[in-house]
């Protein structure tokens, strides 16, 4: 994201704390291997600093930080430490083998924390800052000091703390909105005042770290930069304590998109953001909300007819960034009751249909009626609306019978009889489990190149006699089809769903073949 017109004074350092603050989110614990995967990803996408963990918290955390420090090629690797000598020693040991290591130490500064948590006086805390920052600086050249709960700390005392930390050797000063209490103008002003009043402020980089308790984490982070901060601490997907942290993807795209009013830049490659979101979501088992900015499923999806019409004519009518800029292939037009005729026609063309005006209008009327009754409209639903012969085409493959031999030892075996274009074929196959055997039998009887993307089983009702509803998604030539089938026998339902998906692929190929030949 660098530009010849920008300078280092306008550069914003991106400090990712997904592996430390993000993992403190209840339920978001990652395995050692998952931490290494996330760290490698962050290192390659242009993140400047990776806070890899809290080394003294556990043996596992120490080992993860140490391993990440050894492996990182680009990013500074930071280890967190309380203002306790043993913590600082442990953090120093963890980042010792990093190409560029950092110790990040912190202490509370607000009256409520000093009185009720630390039970220390203001002078006591100033002494702690001097001693612990100096200790850290003796171990590494890069030391970050944080004033915990800085936004509820009186400005005069906060200035004294910052001056003390810099004098002791801190190279970065982080002023976190620990409890998500600040509002943007207040936070911007705090940085401006401190940088003006602290005599040695020019010897350190100032940093923001904002929590989202009031939904202002990203706004506050950007306000802090306007006040003179040049490091933003954030996490992928905004995960973190309580309501979370500033989301890295939102911070990066705000800087990239609004350069007209925020003349800053950062090193993160924006096309990696969607993949990063998915990797962290999978590692933490925390799903990304559908309407999440930048990386949510609906971030580039449009259902309103007015919006769909505008996007089809010119994407910039309703999109302030391109989906490709964040690693999404294309804008998604979600077909539903709000969709207009233009978007419906566009979807039909994607599916290989070119209808006359009267046919299009008739299909559109039936589509709107279906959308009023059905929550989710799939491509297959639309195909069924406009193809009167679709049902017969889907019956080209039909399950006649299925026998599966399963046991506790050895491979499972499936014997299947399928009707293909009116002719019965029979064959058998083995697999690692009965479902695998069934699907292998289908492949033997009906050779194809489709890949299985999804296999799900749900009980339709309660009880041991419940029907099983099986969903199968197959992909071929970069396009996917989904089919469902229900049966009291899960294996029969699985076979029917798989065959139904193949029928849809065959139907699509037949429909598009004349178009391909004509082109």
From Swiss-Prot:
Signal peptide residues on this chain, from the entry's feature table: none
Record keywords: Amino-acid biosynthesis, Branched-chain amino acid biosynthesis, Cytoplasm, Leucine biosynthesis, Manganese, Metal-binding, Transferase
Residue segments, region Regulatory domain: 398-519
Molecular-function GO term, any one: manganese ion binding
Annotated ranges, domain Pyruvate carboxyltransferase: 12-274
Compartments where found: Cytoplasm
SUBUNIT field: Homodimer.
Protein name: 2-isopropylmalate synthase
Organism: Afipia carboxidovorans (strain ATCC 49405 / DSM 1227 / KCTC 32145 / OM5)
């Amino acid at each position: 994201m660098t530009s010849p017109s920008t300078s280092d004074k306008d550069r914003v350092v991106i400090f990712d704390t997904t592996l430390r603050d993000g993992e403190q989110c209840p339920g978001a614990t990652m395995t050692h291997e998952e931490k290494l995967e996330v760290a490698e990803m962050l290192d390659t996408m242009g993140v400047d600093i990776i806070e890899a963990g809290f080394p003294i918290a556990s043996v596992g955390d120490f080992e993860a930080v140490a391993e990440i420090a050894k492996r990182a090629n680009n990013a500074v690797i930071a280890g967190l430490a309380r203002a306790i000598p043993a913590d600082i020693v442990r953090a120093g040991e963890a980042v010792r083998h990093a190409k560029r290591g950092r110790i990040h130490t912190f202490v509370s500064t607000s009256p409520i924390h000093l009185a009720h948590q630390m039970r220390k006086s203001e002078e006591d805390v100033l002494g702690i800052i001097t001693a612990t920052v100096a200790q850290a600086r003796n171990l590494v050249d890069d030391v970050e000091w944080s004033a915990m709960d800085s936004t509820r700390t009186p400005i005069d005392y906060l200035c004294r703390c910052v001056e003390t930390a810099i004098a002791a050797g801190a190279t970065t000063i982080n002023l976190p909105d620990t409890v998500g209490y600040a509002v943007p103008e207040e936070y911007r002003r705090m940085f401006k005042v401190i940088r003006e009043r602290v005599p040695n402020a020019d010897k350190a980089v100032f940093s923001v770290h904002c929590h989202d308790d009031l939904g202002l984490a990203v706004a506050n982070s950007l306000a802090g930069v306007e006040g003179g901060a040049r490091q933003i601490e954030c996490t992928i997907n905004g995960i973190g304590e309580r309501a979370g942290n500033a989301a890295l993807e939102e911070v990066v795209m705000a800087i990239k998109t609004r350069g007209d009013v925020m003349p800053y830049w950062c090193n993160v490659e924006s096309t990696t953001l969607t993949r990063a979101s998915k990797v962290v979501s999978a590692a933490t088992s925390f799903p990304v909300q559908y309407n999440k900015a930048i990386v949510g499923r609906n971030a580039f999806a449009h259902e309103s007819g007015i919006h769909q019409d505008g996007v089809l004519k010119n994407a910039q009518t309703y999109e302030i960034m391109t989906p490709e800029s964040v690693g999404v292939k294309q804008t998604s037009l979600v077909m539903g009751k709000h969709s207009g005729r233009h978007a419906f026609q566009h979807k039909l063309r994607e599916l290989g249909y070119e209808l006359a005006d009267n046919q299009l209008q008739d299909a559109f009327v039936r589509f709107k009626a279906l959308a009023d009754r059905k929550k989710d409209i799939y491509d297959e639903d639309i195909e069924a609306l406009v193809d009167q012969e679709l049902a017969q085409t889907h019956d080209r493959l039909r399950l006649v019978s299925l026998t599966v031999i399963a046991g506790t030892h050895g491979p499972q075996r499936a014997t299947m009889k399928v009707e293909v274009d009116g002719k019965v074929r029979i064959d058998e196959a083995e697999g690692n489990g009965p479902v695998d055997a069934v699907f292998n039998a289908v492949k033997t009887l009906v050779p194809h190149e489709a890949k299985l993307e999804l296999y799900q089983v749900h009980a339709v009702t309660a009880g041991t006699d419940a029907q099983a509803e099986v969903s199968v998604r197959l992909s071929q030539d970069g396009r996917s089809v989904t089919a469902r089938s229900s049966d009291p026998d899960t294996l029969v339902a699985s076979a029917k769903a798989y065959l139904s998906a193949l029928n849809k692929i065959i139907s699509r190929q037949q429909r598009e073949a004349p178009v391909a030949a004509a082109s």
